[in-house]
Amino acid sequence: FWIDLRLPLHDNDTPAQCWAQFRVSLPAWSNETQHELIETLQLAPHLDKRLNMLSTGSRRKVGLVAALASGATVTLLDQPFVSLDQPSIRSLQAFLAQQGQNTDRAWLIADYEEPAHLPLVSVIQL
């Protein structure tokens, strides 16, 4: 799974339209995860707004919902905490910590430093 919502391709789409497009091509998509993350990442007030109307942090949250709900076997999260508010960072950390017990999916986090409060199986320094 790959997405970069900074690209202008999705500027005129709402979050719901983006997720509907991804859901079609992702058979393991989790509606339950999508709805849980909409709540915990506080995206409900933004569901009818076009992406080009959202802040950088809210736009990143839309992409994170897609990545986390995708059901992809391997998901790379490139600097997932950038531009997020503290409650969203804590929610994302809690979600990833919970998913760490799931052996059906692998999560790769690329970042400049190890995320605090998130147990990691392995760390590769480049």
Where are these regions (language model features)?
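Conserved ABC ATPase signature
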Residues: 50-59
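Conserved ABC ATPase "signature" region
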Residues: 32-46
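ABC ATPase nucleotide-binding domain signature region
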Residues: 1-24, 115-116
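ABC-family nucleotide-binding domains
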Residues: 78, 84-89
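Hydrophobic anchor residue at the start of the ABC signature
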Residues: 64
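Hydrophobic residue in the Walker B motif beta-strand
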Residues: 73-75
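Conserved catalytic loops of ABC-family nucleotide-binding domains
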Residues: 87, 95-117
